[in-house]
Amino acid sequence: MSDASAGGWADRDSYLVSTDWLGEHLDDPKIRILDCRMYFDGRLGIDAYNQGHIPGADFINWGTELATKENPVAFKMARSEQMKRVMEAHGVGDDTLLVAYDEEGGHHAARVWLAMLVHGHEAGFRILEGGLTKWQQEGRPISTAPAEARTVTFTPLAGPADVLVTAEHVLSAANDTNAVVVDVRRLTEYTGEEVRAVRGGRVPGSVRVFWQDLLHWDTDRTFKSPQEIRALLAAAGVTPDRRAITYCQGAVRAAHTALVLKMLGYENVEVYDGSWEEWGSRPDLPIATG
């Protein structure tokens, strides 16, 4: 019996590495570590990086570097030319294993995963489970030294065509019993009490699965057991037989939940790239509140 059929992970090792593993591979020249920390309270990720990071890590401001400049939606996915330029600037080449971390359980690192997936390099990417939170709790080394420069070539490839979806696709899926639209935001965002676009609310028919509930958020921010996560998802109607479309405010938290679904073996997983920032700002699209 497979782990997935027994309620376990279908494919955890293709997405995560442990702090033990990274600790043993810090000097591996084939690995590039990226610090993906970002804050929405006035702090800057680069300042946190300069104060201390995992040895050898480089800092990526993914919110600007991996977002297209041609779209008003904040984090709309970068195109291939931009992806190539950014990855090469950070020393990530075609043969590199990129290990990304943050201090929010992989929340921000997952957006980098989504970029690597879209541009055909998912196999060369892992998230550090527990991130800097677990790393520091274990008393592992911290450095203030900048990352060593590397000359590499990154070649964007054609990733899966159906990963990022449009508002029109989501609207159609909301009325499809074989699909489920998954809102991973806070309850106040879901109900419309907290307004972060022109309008507050949610996609009609969407179900809510709060992304932090998939993690041991109050301790080391590693993932809960697959059995716990499967039960939480099933209670919301997010089952493997249905196509799942995740969204949040800017497709960052949504990327994190999509990654979890992939680890569990869900075969049809999509991310609404525009998310609520787009949906809530388009008067032609319906909303639900309360």
Annotate each predicted stretch with a short phrase.
Residues 2-12, 74-173, 193-194, 253-275:
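Thiolate-centered catalytic microenvironments shared by cysteine-dependent enzyme domains
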Residues 68, 102, 150, 212, ...:
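Amphipathic, positively biased hydrophobic alpha-helical segments used for protein targeting
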Residues 6-92, 166-240, 281, 287-290:
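Positively charged, proline/Ser/Thr-rich regional signature most characteristic
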Residues 101-102, 197, 201, 244-247, ...:
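Short glycine- and Lys/Arg-enriched binding-loop motifs that mark or flank ligand-binding interfaces
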Residues 231-290:
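C-terminal appended segment following the main domain
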Residues 33, 100, 127, 181-183, ...:
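Structural beta-sheet core signal
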